[in-house]
Amino acid sequence: MSSKSKNTLKILFVSAEIAPFSSVGGLSQVAYFLPRALLKMGVDIRLFTPKYGTIEEKKFPLKKIIDELKVPTDKPNESSQPQELICNVKVIKNPKKTEPVVYFLENMEYFEKRSNVYGYSDDHIRFGLLSRGALEFIQKKLFVPDLIHCNDWHTGYLLNYLRQNYKDNPLLKKISTLFSIHNLYQGNFDFTHATELDFDDGKSQLSSFFSERFFKQNSLKRGIMYADVVNTVSENYAREILTEEYGAGLHNLFKELRGKLYGILNGLDYTDFNPQTDKIIKKNYSSINLHDRAENKIDLQKQFNLEIRPEVPLLAVSGRLDEQKGLDLIIETIDFLLSELDIQFVVLGGGQPKYIGFFEELEKRYHGKVGTHLMPNFVLPRKIFAGADIILLPSRYEPGGVVALEALRYGCIPIVRATGGLADSVVDFDPEKGIGTGFTFKKFTRENFIVAITRALETFKNKSVWIKIIRQAMQQDFSWNKVAEKYLDLYKRASEFRKESLLPNPPMALRQIVT
């Protein structure tokens, strides 16, 4: 059991990826920064994640704390498959007191032998093992949490197991739960085109790990159903997923359970992302001494082989080049803008070949006006945020939108489609009031996008107004400390929900799905 005070809130944060041990997408960054912010606030938060074969044990030496943890697979007696999968649990040797404890679930077949975090045909088994392994770990009583914080479809199984298979377990049944949805990906099976025979209503018992039925049971859906509280990574996205357009086939379920659905915008590490101290950029600056920012623009122009023209508006795209990010809209627009206006344009990121080919040709046609780096890079984004005037983010949908937060921090003004987290993080500039941190548009059309860009470029001509927008952008507070406070509120709501649901006659609102 924890050595901390009995009154200390104890959280087990379960995630398929956690930076710096395993990092594929934004989830790993949330799993890194949010627990650290909560730890500073006095929460006893610990993490539970697979021990993948890619984790460098020289860099992160581990010690075993549980040997041969038996995780049930629920396989039928007549099956030749194992009834249990044997795992170990490890922790980092000599961890820093400023960092949360991380428990690594070790299994040779499903984690250790795999070179990637995702992308396997048996991912449903792998994350079923993670989910049930976490519950078996808790029963060893090395750490018994008050709440389990689950993330994305990989851990939806855990919430289902907890409320069905372990519903009468005296140690587990009182534990409250929060399910954070970072995106609506639902695993390898295509649930949106499932036949009537394959439809999963979410109420049946989870099948054996090795059965075809388990593959077709929707972990994300079940996590939503069985969690005490559900949140997405922005308030606006929480509203959007109630609609057919954004709900990925789950909009009716979200509407049914909207009473327990919340949105919290992700944060940004203001110590790491700090233009005053950032060693990556050419010249440090702040919202007060913005004149130093100009050196970064010249540096960016040199880096991308552009003409050195500090007075020309420099527009940028940074991130994954795919349809979700609105690349089709950029392609429909950018050629016209470059031919008609005196602007420069840089593109950074890897992605779909059709987009890469387009930007390669664009750079050839507009030599000196267009620069590209068409592969992922972890250094250049900072240089773009510090040197570009405008970042283009015309996403089709965007649950969180961390690129906008990074750009705002460095005074690179976003032009965004007002969707998901982008609508929550960027304030459309109002010229009459002089208030705003960027430029927004709603309809996903070329015309609306061009209007937003035109508004920004016209405003750019008025240097005093543009500097005011930059200052307002840089002074926004999206720190993880603020985010952590909001998660604490959700933890309290989840705890209240669990206590009420355990009453002999729970309120009708709590009898939603689980009976």
Predicted regions and their residues:
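Catalytic cores of nucleotide-sugar-dependent glycosyltransferases that transfer UDP/GDP/TDP-activated
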Residues: 1-515
